[in-house]
Amino acid sequence: MSSIEEQITKSDSDFIISEDQSYLSKEKKADGSATINTADEQSSTDELQKSMSTGVLVNGDLYPSPTEEELATLPRVCGTIPWKAFIIIIVELCERFAYYGLTVPFQNYMQFGPKDATPGALNLGESGADGLSNFFTFWCYVTPVGAALIADQFLGRYNTIVCSAVIYFIGILILTCTAIPSVIDAGKSMGGFVVSLIIIGLGTGGIKSNVSPLMAEQLPKIPPYVKTKKNGSKVIVDPVVTTSRAYMIFYWSINVGSLSVLATTSLESTKGFVYAYLLPLCVFVIPLIILAVSKRFYKHTPPSGSIFVRVGQVFFLAAQNKFNLEKTKPSCTTTVGRVTLKDQWDDLFIDELKRALRACKTFLFYPIYWVCYGQMTNNLISQAGQMQTGNVSNDLFQAFDSIALIIFIPICDNIIYPLLRKYNIPFKPILRITLGFMFATASMIYAAVLQAKIYQRGPCYANFTDTCVSNDISVWIQIPAYVLIAFSEIFASITGLEFAFTKAPPSMKSIITALFLFTNAFGAILSICISSTAVNPKLTWMYTGIAVTAFIAGIMFWVCFHHYDAMEDEQNQLEFKRNDALTKKDVEKEVHDSYSMADESQYNLEKATAEEEIMKST
């Protein structure tokens, strides 16, 4: 580690970074004005920039920046994930507990009547239930876009999450009321059920588009640096790896929460739907309490207000220059009419916007992927109902997707990915997403083969009726389809979320994340379009068609975007350029905020020592 001795001063904030990299806050007079500790403010700022250019300041210690050779040869490791991020992850876990606990029983609730062999409520049939299920999925992934706009421009992420959580709770309460047996028997559940779907969709959309960006915002915003381990070996602490691990943990928590299906499906079959929906309602109280008491602990990106106006101005100016975004940079075009561009945005903002647009292009193929993923929530549940389930509910088997993810996410994060990084084997986002498409294809191929086997068995063969609902084939051989989908999520879904966040400008992270989630809505539309084929005996061909389409989409995705992997490191550096472009006040605030209030006594001691050194030097 290098040693430094710096003074940083400004009229409204002064800090001293001493040889051990601790800092001192500004002195204030009785009238509240600041005391200036040096006469040469500009010199101090220059010295700060010089020291930061040769190293990275982390918790008061200065670590060297990696050289080109070190970037190419040293293994990359994860940095520290702050506890604040884990609190937000707990909120997401509870929200997903509620969401999956509610939605997995939906298929039976919608498809069957209360007197059927598999009890339900609305008696819509498989095709009708699939249509309403796909509408709900579509709605849940449309609402994040509106919520993201509200968060980025008006309320901020945290406030949007709080409002959405309250709306969500109201929706679950209405849903629970529709499942009361007397309401079902009276045939009055349909209206309340549809209303609850709309309200729950609003709530989950507001949380979905903002909770992962809020979590990722709590991670340290520092460039890569070289750290020497206790055994003398060197590693690069890479924020990209830190972000990747945070999203792995985030997605892992989603699937821990989704195990609520084990409880709600059991309650559905033994106690009834009202108890299955009452459990998520009670659990959802936990995130409401957490959100109510934890606001002061988080880092908050304030709403940007005019960010979308600026983006519109950029696109308007680009359209006047043959859609060349380079021509919208202030360094290329100084004014438009009476507007000075440097007062509206800088060159770096244009580079960030170009990076975000590249990310959005990759989202275009995701609807095909979500069609594969969506089979797990409707048609695969119905497929399980055509098999021998014993005393196990057919909608319970979706839990094997979550179980597989809970097992294999830590294996990938702690064994496979570090091993690849250790030997400098590139496994960058586009390659991971392509692999996700291939696993989704494999899952649909397996489902198609299994459906053909079901049709070959009696007593129903392909002629299922109200009195003949299942063939003589064990449901347990359906598990590999869920496991293959789980692998596809590790590579396609997690990477997509991470890609959306890391490639978005700071003031647009919610909206870019929402646009990624919005691809789910298009997947739901495609699923609605093919829902007419989700009937016997066409299901084998439906799964086959989905598999072929997903395979072609995966190949085209790789062909179109594989060159993005070569640009990955360069694109990630834009985030740190933005940090380097912070004003001195922002830099000082970062240092000040990093100093724990618990160390106040040590701080006062260092302050007195530094003041004594200053007096000696003057």
UniProtKB/Swiss-Prot annotation:
Gene Ontology molecular functions: dipeptide transmembrane transporter activity; tripeptide transmembrane transporter activity
Main location: membrane
Stretches that traverse the bilayer: 131-151, 161-181, 187-207, 247-267, 273-293, 400-420, 430-450, 475-495, 510-530, 541-561
Keyword Phosphoprotein: yes
Chain positions found as Phosphotyrosine: Y23
Region (Disordered), start-end ranges: 26-50
Modified residues (Phosphothreonine): T35, T45, T54, T618
GO biological processes: dipeptide import across plasma membrane; negative regulation of TORC1 signaling; protein transport; tripeptide import across plasma membrane
Membrane topology type: Multi-pass membrane protein
Compositional bias of kind Polar residues: 34-50
Locations listed in the record: Membrane
CDD domains: MFS_PTR2
Keywords, sorted A to Z: Membrane, Peptide transport, Phosphoprotein, Protein transport, Transmembrane, Transmembrane helix, Transport
Cellular component terms (Gene Ontology): cell division site; fungal-type vacuole; plasma membrane; plasma membrane of cell tip; vacuolar membrane
Xref: InterPro entries: MFS_trans_sf, POT_fam, PTR2_symporter_CS
Modified residues (Phosphoserine): S22, S25, S33, S44, S51, S53, S594
Top-level taxonomic group: Eukaryota
PROSITE patterns: PTR2_1, PTR2_2
Family the entry assigns: Belongs to the major facilitator superfamily. Proton-dependent oligopeptide transporter (POT/PTR) (TC 2.A.17) family.
Function according to Swiss-Prot or TrEMBL: Uptake of small peptides.
Protein name, UniProt field: Probable peptide transporter ptr2
Organism ancestry: Eukaryota, Fungi, Dikarya, Ascomycota, Taphrinomycotina
